[in-house]
From Swiss-Prot:
Protein name according to UniProt: NAD kinase
Annotated function: Involved in the regulation of the intracellular balance of NAD and NADP, and is a key enzyme in the biosynthesis of NADP. Catalyzes specifically the phosphorylation on 2'-hydroxyl of the adenosine moiety of NAD to yield NADP.
Cofactor section: a divalent metal cation
Cited Gene3D superfamilies: Probable inorganic polyphosphate/atp-NAD kinase, domain 1, Probable inorganic polyphosphate/atp-NAD kinase, domain 2
Residues reported in the UniProt entry to bind NAD(+): D45, G46, N121, E122, R147, D149, T160, A161, Y162, N163, K164, S165, A184
EC numbers: 2.7.1.23
Pfam families (UniProt xref): NAD_kinase (PF01513), NAD_kinase_C (PF20143)
Source organism (scientific name): Limosilactobacillus reuteri (strain DSM 20016) (Lactobacillus reuteri)
Residue numbers annotated as active site: D45
Reactions catalysed: NAD(+) + ATP = ADP + NADP(+) + H(+)
Length: 270
């Protein structure tokens, strides 16, 4: 089995990487820099997001394993002091995996050009210069005319990230679908939006048709683009749906999702 390592640049992550490589070599495991079958990320959820996009063209052939060297992460099952246990699990690996849905995003520009993206956590669109105005279509039917700061579209596993910060619901990661959450929507006697998150099923398509040409900021996980109208080219439409691809994690032990939610956001219950 070919094992790759993807770490951040902190001193602790560098130390853990060195220890892991030493223990893997001692156990007879193969470390590779290209074409891995298992990728071990060392850092936090941000590091795993970066690794996901680094290897996104080969997702069907890779299983991820996360070691967190800082705060508790939702994608990182192992702590830095559990290297020996992880190496033992790698030696006994039988291909066991758990997978989660991803989000496909298609951006259409006024010149007809189309750009495709894939998100593990979320995509957001907002206008930083004025109220964002867009028409929201669900399965090609106009649902509402949105006015506000922006919109957040997230996966089930991404529902605990930025989506939660803007008032979205936390969704069981075993669900297949995606969620739309509003960012500071404008509601008064003239303009109205639904004012609550929407959770879509596996076959739904969400389309956002933008009315303004300038000032939009588009994100896909950790990547961000400031979009400006240049020579008649500007963003006109975004479409979202559940991706045909999935992300796979090596499942060496069971870590209860709802226990992580409780530990991260609630703490001890008295």
């Amino acid at each position: 089995m070919r094992i790759g390592i993807y770490n951040n640049e902190t001193a602790e992550s560098q130390r853990v990487t060195k220890v892991l490589k030493t223990e893997m070599k001692r156990a007879g495991l193969t470390y590779v820099e290209k074409n891995p079958e298992v990728v071990i990320t060392i850092g936090g959820d941000g590091t795993l997001l970066s690794a996901f996009h680094h290897y996104q063209k080969d997702l069907n052939n890779i299983r991820f394993v996360g070691i967190h060297t800082g705060h508790l992460g939702f994608y990182t099952d192992w702590r830095s002091f559990e290297i020996d246990d992880l190496v033992d699990s790698l030696v006994k690996d039988s291909g066991q995996a758990v997978s989660y849905p991803l989000l496909d995003m298609k951006a259409t520009y006024s010149d007809g050009q189309i750009e495709n993206y894939i998100a593990l956590n979320e995509s957001t669109i907002r206008n930083v210069t004025r109220t964002m105005v867009c028409d929201v279509f669900i399965n090609n039917h106009l649902f509402e005319n949105f006015r506000g700061d922006g919109l957040c579209i997230s996966t089930p596993t991404g529902s605990t990230a930025y989506n939660k910060s803007v008032g979205g619901a936390i969704v069981d990661p075993n669900s297949v679908g995606f969620q739309l959450a509003e960012m500071a929507s404008l509601n008064n006697r003239v303009f109205r939006t639904l004012g609550s998150p929407i959770i879509f099923g596996a076959d739904a398509e969400l389309i956002l048709r933008l009315r303004d040409e300038n000032g939009h900021v588009l994100t896909c996980d950790r990547d961000q683009w400031m979009l400006k109208s240049e020579k008649e080219r500007y963003l006109t439409e975004l479409s979202y749906k559940v991706s045909k691809q999935r992300i796979y994690f090596a499942q060496y032990r069971h870590n209860n999702f709802w226990n992580r939610v409780k530990d991260s956001f609630i703490g001890g219950v008295h």
